[in-house]
Design a protein with these regions (language model features):
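C-terminal transmembrane module of polytopic alpha-helical membrane proteins
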Residues: 1-48, 58-59, 69, 77, ...
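Hydrophobic, helix-prone linear segments
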Residues: 1-60, 202-207, 211-225, 230, ...
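Intrinsically disordered, low-complexity Ser/Thr/Pro/Gly-rich regulatory segments
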Residues: 88, 112-121
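A detector for small-residue-rich transmembrane helices and their helix-helix packing motifs
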Residues: 99-104, 109-112, 145-408, 413-418, ...
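Conserved beta-strand termini and adjacent loop/short-helix elements that scaffold enzyme active sites
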Residues: 27, 120-125
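Short beta-alpha junction loops
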Residues: 89-95, 123-127
């Protein structure tokens, strides 16, 4: 036979789940204990309701301590700043001994009392007062017509049935959020990445700066020259097998998750814009030659963060803390390793969040907010495009490295054009002029080569290769005396160089034979 307290127990649960939209966290096998979570994180109070006929207050005290330990452990695992629990006991009678002092103040845990457990006992003699006491913490006043329900037993069964029906429907609705689409574009992007990697390898190597530039890596001078497609192409190129492997695995898992949540069309927009915004920030803030899908993959993180903004409880209950930790580790790693293009990662993260906020989640429409985010995105792109084009970042070392690769492959004209279009930097000016002079020698422009080599020596008097090449030019022109002097200078700087010794010996022998 059902008691008034059973009716009260299920009546309160029904109101919380059906009317107040609370979610069932856990329920005991006998349905006598239930934990409920509020619909928003703004309401930090978790509710635990126990249907148990109390006898002695020391049992009550022990149970309250167990609840406190569980809740504090949960708070620390989820890294919450604070967590409160309304711990409600539904009992036919109060404890037989003195008990009110045990529930008068909340139990607390944590250095700054971050965890609080407010305990209440509602028994047959204080139902209305007990409901009134918990109403200010629950932010609503539970109303249960126990007498009516007791006279109609089916009403109690309907209360129970409605609780679990609504709870199951909420679970089903949440599951549908993660199963909206299928990962079609994810697999297409993976295939493109793999195809481009093999193309790079067969074209000279994916770690070759020249090959990367040829196939569309982010290279600031080329973007400034009008090659706008370099804002998109880098996301499909990878530098070495390990780079490809890490990004492909990340795309497989993250991309699949995001595409299932947002659907294929939205995912395509998010991924492409994140890749673009990652390249844009790298263009504006970094001078390095770069490639990789990392920016677009960070955009997937950004999209998941937006999902967390819309569904915070579900986000933190399923993947939230893991996502935040992975993002934090990756960003810290990027700041500590100079070779990582962290600007691209941050740009992708921001771009993914903004793109997700514009297209929004399926079956979610907030036109005003979407318009605001669209305008924010326009401002974001405009600001960093202005910075990139108005205050361009150059790295002459990249140009010199690529030019050297062209020279090694005897593509002298490509190397010459690249060096001539590279802004001179005092730190690399001597190297740049030396490479230009080398190409000019190969092309037979000895006068230009001579001028550049003399300038190199003025900049760096210890540049031994400049003395040597200049000596070769004078030898070619028949000015053996000047050539001998320059070869001697080169040998003074590097006495053990065989080429320098050989040229010096030849010139000395020629001088002696003439004399």
């Amino acid at each position: 036979m059902n008691s008034k307290q059973d009716v009260l127990y299920w009546g309160i649960i029904n109101q919380l789940v059906v009317q107040e939209n609370y979610r069932i966290l856990t329920v005991s096998n006998d349905h006598q204990e239930i934990w409920l979570e509020p619909p928003t994180r703004k309401k930090k109070r978790v509710i635990r309701i126990l249907r148990h006929d109390l006898d002695w207050s020391n049992w009550l005290e022990r149970d309250m301590q167990v609840v406190l330990q569980k809740v504090d452990s949960l708070r620390r695992k989820t890294i919450r700043r604070g967590l409160e629990v309304v711990n409600l006991y539904i009992s036919t009678f109060p404890p037989v001994d003195d008990w009110e002092f045990r529930t008068k103040e909340p139990l607390v845990a944590g250095k700054n009392s971050e965890t609080k457990v407010h305990s209440f006992v509602i028994h047959s003699e204080n139902i209305q007062q007990g409901l009134s006491d918990i109403s200010h913490l629950l932010q609503f006043h539970p109303r249960v017509d126990t007498d009516k329900i007791l006279t109609e037993p089916l009403l109690l069964e309907n209360l129970k049935k409605e609780v679990f029906t609504v709870a199951q429907q909420k679970v089903k609705t949440e599951q549908q959020l993660f199963q909206y689409g299928k990962p079609r574009w994810t697999y297409i992007f993976i295939m493109i990445q793999l195809g481009m990697f093999f193309l790079l390898e067969f074209s000279g190597g994916s770690q070759s700066s020249q090959v990367l530039m040829k196939f569309g890596a982010k290279y600031n001078p080329s973007i400034l020259a009008g090659e706008w497609w370099r804002f998109f192409t880098p996301m499909f190129l990878h530098i070495g097998f390990l780079h490809l492997l890490m990004n492909t695995v990340a795309l497989f898992y993250l991309g699949s998750a995001v595409e299932k949540i947002f659907g294929s069309t939205r995912f395509f927009i998010i991924y492409m814009f994140a890749g673009f915004s990652g390249t844009l920030l790298s263009f504006a803030l970094s001078s390095s030659l770069s490639a990789g899908a990392s920016g677009a993959i960070f955009g997937c993180f950004g999209a998941l963060l937006f999902f967390g903004v819309i569904h915070p409880n579900l986000f933190f209950r399923t993947m939230g803390m893991n996502i935040l930790i992975v993002i934090g580790i990756n960003l810290l790693f990027g700041f500590s390793v100079p070779s990582i293009d962290n600007a691209g990662h941050i740009g992708g993260l921001i771009g993914g969040f903004l793109a997700a906020s514009i297209v929004h989640l399926p079956k979610h429409k907030h036109l005003v907010k979407q318009t605001i985010f669209l305008l924010t995105t326009v401002i974001f792109v405009s600001v960093f495009a202005y910075l990139g084009f108005s205050y361009p970042k150059f790295d002459p070392a990249v140009s010199l490295s690529v030019a050297q690769e062209y020279i090694d492959k005897e593509d002298y004209q490509a190397a010459y054009d690249l060096l001539r279009n590279t802004s001179q930097d005092h730190q690399y000016e001597a190297d740049q002029l030396f490479l230009l002079s080398y190409i000019e020698i190969k092309q037979g422009n000895f006068d230009l080569a001579k001028q550049n080599l003399l300038t190199v020596i003025d900049i760096d008097p210890l540049y031994d290769e400049a003395y040597f090449n200049l000596a070769l030019i004078y030898t070619h022109e028949g000015n053996y005396e000047q050539a001998l002097e320059l070869s001697e200078d080169a040998l003074d700087i590097k006495p053990n160089n065989k080429d320098y010794k050989e040229l010096y010996t030849q010139l000395m022998n020629s001088k002696e034979s003439v004399e």
